[in-house]
Curated annotation (Swiss-Prot):
Role, per record: Involved in the biosynthesis of the chorismate, which leads to the biosynthesis of aromatic amino acids. Catalyzes the reversible NADPH linked reduction of 3-dehydroshikimate (DHSA) to yield shikimate (SA).
Primary enzyme class: oxidoreductase
Protein residues bound to NADP(+): 127-131, 151-156, 219, 242
Database matches in Pfam families: SDH_C, Shikimate_DH, Shikimate_dh_N
MF terms in GO: NADP binding; shikimate 3-dehydrogenase (NADP+) activity
Family to which this protein belongs: Belongs to the shikimate dehydrogenase family.
Reactions that this protein is recorded to catalyse: shikimate + NADP(+) = 3-dehydroshikimate + NADPH + H(+)
Name recorded for this polypeptide: Shikimate dehydrogenase (NADP(+))
EC annotation from Swiss-Prot or TrEMBL: 1.1.1.25
Organism the protein comes from: Geobacillus sp. (strain WCH70)
InterPro entries: Aminoacid_DH-like_N_sf, NAD(P)-bd_dom_sf, SDH_C, Shikimate_DH, Shikimate_DH-bd_N, Shikimate_DH_fam, Shikm_DH/Glu-tRNA_Rdtase
Pathway as given in its UniProt record: Metabolic intermediate biosynthesis; chorismate biosynthesis; chorismate from D-erythrose 4-phosphate and phosphoenolpyruvate: step 4/7
PANTHER family (alphabetical): BIFUNCTIONAL 3-DEHYDROQUINATE DEHYDRATASE_SHIKIMATE DEHYDROGENASE, CHLOROPLASTIC (PTHR21089:SF1), SHIKIMATE DEHYDROGENASE (PTHR21089)
Length: 277
């Protein structure tokens, strides 16, 4: 019998996950189908009950449900608990277990696409939202030397550091302070939506003080190259867009569900084709 996998979010109509996962199932001869379900926040509890009732094998959880879903599960992986968000659910014989593949997916993409060793690197994270939390914890777990955070609301960045409780040295800066200190960092990461379609003229931070060969990474993938990344390229930065994080978080979820790691290059090709339309 064909297994069913799902995406729960609000909205989900724009998601590239179904096309990416269904191609992977087909490519690997796995009898399964992945479907996106629009789930309003007040119906999340019902949707999770539906996973149990219908025997849905696994679920991806996206905005705005990643934190709200946690108390509805039977078990939450320790890393996901530290991050404070779940994006992947595995239905193991009726027990629903929550994981977070966003942060680990980001780090895998960074290491494999840029061929960088995170250990001993000095990193600046822009933003302190859900995506920043996963990336912060995962980079700390990989042995980063310093992970500083700059955010419009400084108190939110401080809260992230306190709650994630990672064993790494971290300082919080305002955007202006961070811009002045850019030369101190090996890796700059934008975890905000600044510069995303349709506001493509915006940049999260000026790169005027960036040193050459800094890795500049943006988790946005629409557009494929944000204005910020274009600017970094002009300044001889090593750039990375958000396609890798999206693909690797999906690939790690796929592996949690099936025990098989999919062909990420094929996944990437499909996602880029869809984005180019």
């Amino acid at each position: 019998m064909e297994k069913l996998y799902a995406l729960f979010g609000c909205p989900v109509h724009h998601s590239l996950s179904p096309i990416m996962h269904n191609d992977a199932f087909q490519n690997m001869n796995i009898a399964a189908h992945y479907h996106a379900f629009h789930v309003e926040p007040e119906r999340l509890k019902d949707a999770i009950a539906g996973v149990r009732a219908l025997g849905i094998s696994g679920v991806n959880v996206t905005i705005p449900h990643k934190t709200a879903v946690m108390p509805l599960l039977d078990e939450v992986d320790p890393t996901a608990r530290r991050i404070g968000a779940v994006n992947t659910i595995v239905n193991r014989n009726g027990r629903l277990i929550g994981y977070n593949t966003d942060g680990p997916g980001y780090v895998r993409a960074l290491e494999e696409e840029i061929n960088v060793d995170i250990k001993e690197k000095r990193i600046l994270l822009i933003g302190a939202g859900g995506a920043a939390r996963g990336i912060y914890v995962s980079l700390a777990d990989r042995g980063a030397k310093q992970i500083d955070i700059c955010n419009r609301t400084v108190s939110k960045a401080k809260q992230l550091i306190d709650e994630c409780n990672a064993s790494v040295s971290s300082v919080v800066y305002s955007l202006n302070e961070a811009e002045e200190r850019l030369g101190e960092y090996d890796i700059l990461i934008n975890t905000t939506s600044v510069g995303m379609y349709p506001n493509m003229e915006e940049m999260p931070l000026s790169l005027a003080n960036m040193k050459e060969e800094t890795i500049v990474s943006d988790i946005i993938y629409n557009p494929l190259e944000t204005k910020w990344l274009k600017e970094a390229r002009k300044r001889n930065g090593i750039i990375q867009n958000g396609v890798g994080m999206f693909v690797y978080q999906g690939a790690l979820a796929f592996e949690k569900w099936t025990g098989i790691f999919p062909d990420v290059q094929r996944m990437k090709k499909i996602v880029i084709e869809q984005l180019r339309g």
